[in-house]
From Swiss-Prot:
One of its GO terms (cellular component) is mitochondrial matrix. Its EC number is 1.3.1.104. Keywords: Fatty acid biosynthesis, Fatty acid metabolism, Lipid biosynthesis, Lipid metabolism, Mitochondrion, NADP, Oxidoreductase, Transit peptide. The gene is ETR1. NADP(+) binds at residues 151, 180-183, 203-206, 284-287, 309-311, 372. Homodimer. The lineage of its organism: Eukaryota, Fungi, Dikarya, Ascomycota, Saccharomycotina. This is Enoyl-[acyl-carrier-protein] reductase 1, mitochondrial.
Length: 378
């Protein structure tokens, strides 16, 4: 192997996605590979909502710009999540070998590219990858490895980070909106393993509502209700308390805000006078675009602790936490305790042109509202 013709999805500034993205061709000369360099080839690159926010210029984590693609001006490469195979290693590289499957450890790697030339042992990021498998290891498949970095890792940390004293007898509950999201589907699976009961809130009026409810129950949700039900006095004062009984709704996971987020607080169980355990409201998204408001009496008398969660911030603050979380999620896959959430795969021939590449990505972005899109390379 001497020269690799590669493609990347690039942009020079944030804005309207269909107008700012380009398909950029570039090449990698493996004959000049440095002793501490590796070449990786894409196996799968997801399209996530955070990627689109970053492209639009509305995301707090900014992209990295590079001149390594020989473009007239520095460009950013889209994407924060991706699975790659190591195909070339430098003479001094001992931590990776050809055939290893790796994912970027840090955000803003720029995953939407067919290949990358990466230098190891940089002071700012000495080991940029997490090894998740290899082509001769059949215990983890591509479907599991391709999306392990964000959604299941977020779900794992949401359950693990805020409540440290889960009731071992199974009397604790989680209530979450966005129940049909990728994160929501992993939350119910991981919670079930830990003997934590869950109430998943989904949007009312979806045509496939019965199918969604069945899927969530099959994954391990204890109860599934609609947002209208969650906001109703009957569910707040009678139905949900009847389910919970002597237990406690100790954690509310909010990715919607607005009325949906406010309703979660109403379902939290807390007594500031008698209970040392503070129920937690954790916000990790705001899909409604509306503010999160709830009454001062609920905050005071229930002793509600409100926290924000962001996987990107956790990873930047403590990169090892990302490594540890990914390894724990992979262990759950290997044991069969959790299963991957299906995504919509779009196949791309890695030898195709950069024009074909950008067309496929724009199609995937346009269809991302119908479910998670992942570019799968062959």
């Amino acid at each position: 192997m001497v020269k690799i013709n590669a493609s990347a999805i690039t942009y020079t500034k944030g804005g309207e996605i269909s107008k700012i993205l380009s398909g950029t061709g570039f090449s990698i000369d493996t004959e000049t590979l440095g002793p501490k360099q590796v070449v990786i080839q894409a196996l799968a690159t997801p399209i996530n909502p955070s990627d689109l926010n970053q492209l639009a210029g509305t995301y707090a984590s900014k992209p990295n710009f590079t001149s390594e693609l020989d473009t007239p001006v520095p460009v950013a490469i889209g994407g924060n999540e991706g699975l790659y195979k190591v195909i070339e290693v430098g003479s001094d590289v001992t931590s990776y070998k050809n055939g290893d499957w790796v994912i970027p450890k840090m955000p803003s790697f720029g995953t939407w590219r067919t290949h990358a030339l990466v230098t190891l042992d940089k002071p700012e990021n000495p080991d940029p990858f997490i090894k998740v498998s290899s082509e001769d290891d059949k215990s983890i498949d591509l479907t599991q490895a391709a999306t392990v970095s964000i959604n299941p890792s977020t779900a794992y940390q949401l359950i693990d980070q805020f409540i440290k004293d889960w009731d071992p007898k199974g009397n604790d509950w989680i209530i979450q909106n966005g129940g049909n999201s990728q994160v929501g589907k992993f939350v119910v699976q991981i919670a079930k393993i830990r003997n934590i009961k869950t109430i998943s809130v989904i949007r009312d009026g979806k045509p496939d509502q019965d199918q969604i409810v069945k899927e969530l129950l099959d994954l391990g949700a204890t109860k599934v209700i609609t947002d209208k039900e969650a906001e109703s006095e009957e569910y707040i004062n009678k139905i949900v308390p009847g389910w919970v009984n002597e237990g406690k709704v100790i954690l509310a996971l909010n990715c919607v805000c607005g009325k949906s987020g406010s309703a979660l607080v109403s379902h939290l169980t807390g007594n500031h006078l008698a209970d040392y355990r503070s129920p937690h409201l954790v916000t990790y998204g705001g899909m409604s675009g509306q503010p999160l408001m709830y009454s001062s009496s609920e905050s005071l008398f229930k002793n509600v602790t409100s926290k924000a969660y962001w996987l990107t911030a956790n990873t930047k603050r403590n990169p090892q936490s990302k490594v540890d979380t990914v390894k724990k999620v992979l262990a759950l896959y290997k044991s069969g305790d959790i299963k991957p959430v299906p995504f919509n795969g779009k196949e791309f021939n890695i030898k195709s042109t950069s024009d074909d590449y950008i067309k496929l990505f724009l199609k995937g972005i346009a269809e991302s509202k119908t479910g998670k899109q992942v570019i799968v390379y062959n």
